[in-house]
């Protein structure tokens, strides 16, 4: 038998709370709504921060500004709630529907906007991002005071003010705690950001429907409110059903070409395109390689260090889960074992099993000489007691502080301890032309831990001028020979890679340390100028 409707509004009476008894369905609905409000509000906040980090870089800055905007907007909403004096339940229901609709569709809207706007329209995307975050914050800020006032007005005999505030805030913080754990561990890995947003929008709308039914005796224009609930639920349900198609269409528009892989791991969005021009790998929307010229990058990264060593037997590759650096390392017949430390197991599985991708790396990931360790390189270096003749560091660019720590003195000290006597480490170090100071910051960081450095660069058409640094306890010398079959690197051409024209020449730069992470800020600033 359905619960009875709540009687029409009665005047509030300032009396002590009644003895504890069985909670009514209406009270439960309102307290559950507080739980859902907190959970959904935090999800929308986290989704906006995650999207901003993926699409704009610098996760600390993006999450800080998104959270700050959201909390400030909640304060505005709470202040504005004083001006809502009548029809509290109806106003709460409408706000709940708006939060569900706007918040639920926000990740999809931001994703579409980013893929539809021109590359130089970053400011327009930021305006949309913070406008949506602020709007949701204001609406959520309105809801909690309204719930308290509804509970106090309808159930004044049961709730003393101190108990009311305690109960509401308890449910509020419980909702925030549970979703903070479930968002990264459950929802995003299994639903993705777009469908996670829509799912929680549906939760908001479901609470609105429950409130509509329980307070039907008080609500004016019940049919109109019911139609609004049905409309919001319908829009969100259609969006949920079409979320995959929406994501596919947006990615097709953004990347162009034929997408042969579109998958999400626990760490990143992986997209691989194939067309007449070749195969491209994108991680979180950033190009990682193009098959038509990646050999220039990987030959330049690997062979100057390995060939100069003379007799490398044990090699460590950090990053490079696509296996392309491994392919070049395995050209050296004297190498007995290569250890690949790659954070994302999805990457190594994909590039080992997908026929087109495994063909690019020559099946390197399946080689008997290769040992794959899927873990964080920083932690692994801290714990290992192994040593290696050559260490190849092939991490993504330092676009955020998580990646930036892999370019710090602390990291290079750990790597130095893993170098065997006479060994070399080689690091990819972004573009010395576009990010000149960033490049020389990496060089200065390696030198700050006592290593001798040899900076060099190569032209990779997909990226332009790209930089590398060889570091070790002994100075680097030009090798006597290179492996056969290389397509770009030659002994005669190596000296030219060591020459830096005036627009790439060394500039003063401080070492990048965990305590300052200057490289992330410098990198963001320099590449930001190119994108504006």
Segments predicted by a language model, with ranges:
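Alpha-helical transmembrane segments of multi-pass membrane proteins
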Residues: 1-461, 466-475, 527-532
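SAM/dcSAM-binding transferase cores
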Residues: 474-532
